[in-house]
Structure formats: structure tokens, C-alpha cells
């Protein structure tokens, strides 16, 4: 059995991480550790690369890896290797790629985006716990189109959405455009949640937005993703299920002797914000 949430909190405090940050990290890492989620994006304000390495080595280096992106912005990911292999092997889960600010579908990048991220998987397999990568110099692609060779870049924004298993991801170059074109526009917000049947638990697992014109294919994508989570939950062993359920009870202040039955569902809602930062 892997570490319990109490073990992880104690360890995080031991290496100098505050209680509030430890709670956030456990909430994000635990679903990945037990094999439910594929990945977790850690706020780099909370964590240094050396701390991420220590956490991965403590929690479970057999299945988890840490990826630290240094450019163009710092990002930390905790990744479940087997879950990533599973997700990337299912063609129907490849995200819709939307170029910004044009809001047009990038079918070319969409056809090969998982190949970009599969490079990370290869690096994961060759590293014991954590590694650092500079995306800005690593994600150029040469392709043949109409008998002509072209080069294009997969941006860090697109890579991030793919790593997080979003049903849609934006390809946006911060160096070329000051405005991503999403501010004050009504977007569709897609949310995959876990609920208890008594409705005393509602925990968000994946959440992302996309422009309205792609609602139909993206909704189909998150339906398939929900089914994948249901399948993963069924195959997780009873000890690891109990580990996460105990955390859920602790988080929502549910008595320990209460039996909670968890189920997965998704929702699609409208969202408009004054400013959308990618």
C-alpha cells in the first residue's frame, strides 16, 4: 500500500512546508498517487524542484514522476506514468486544439500533440523521480503538407492542457500576441467531478474551458473521460480507495464511520470573465 494522506502531511511538514500548503499538495497528489488522475499541476509558488523530488521519492517513485518546466513560465507536474500511457493510447481522448487569438481549430497540431507529450513519457521512464525541461526549445515539429516541409511550434499552453488531460487545449504564443482573445467572451466550462450519493461531497477533478463553437466534440470528449475515470476507480484496490476516501472524509469533515459511495459525473456551464489568463 502507498503512503496514507497522514503520512504525506507529516512528511511535508518535516521538510518545511506549511500546513496550508501541505493540505493543497495532498489534495492534488493523492488522486494521482492511487491511480485515478493522470497528473496534477503544482503551483510553483509553493514548491521548489528539490522539494518536488523529495516528495516524489517519498510518495511513490515506482509510478509517479515529477516534471519541472523552466521556460517560458515555471510549472511543476506530478505525473502517473501508467495512466499517461493509457490516456495517450486512446485516440478519442486527444484534445481539440484551438489556436488563439484566432479561435480556429489547429487540426495539424491536434494530430500529433500526444507525440510531443509522449517525449515526456520517454523521459519519465529514464528518470527515477524528477527532471527539468525547457519547453521553449523542445517542441518544434517538422511536417510534410502538400508536398512541402513546414515547421511549427507546439506552445507550452497546448502542452499543459494535454498533460492535464483536458478535452480541449489552447495553442497560444505569449511572445507574439498580447491578447488571447478570450476576455469578456462567453466560454463553455467543462467540469469532471466526483460526488457522494448523499451529495455531501463534490470534488472537482478536471476543469477547463473552451470557446463555444467546439461544444459538441468537447462534450463528447469529457463524456469519454468520465467513463475512463469510472473504469479506473473500479480497478483501484480497496486499500487505496479507502486511503482516498479517508482523505475525502477529513476534507469535508464527514465522520470516519460514515460509508460514502462515490460516483463520477461531468457538467457543462457558461462562463464569462473580464480577463482570462493562460
Swiss-Prot record:
* Gene Ontology cellular component list: cytosol; nucleus
Alphabetical list of Pfam families matching this protein: DUF4504 (PF14953)
* InterPro entries linked: DUF4504
Q: Which PANTHER family match?
A: UPF0739 PROTEIN C1ORF74
**Can you name this protein?**
Uncharacterized protein C14F5.01
| Species assigned in the record | Schizosaccharomyces pombe (strain 972 / ATCC 24843)
Upper classification of the source organism reads: Eukaryota, Fungi, Dikarya, Ascomycota, Taphrinomycotina
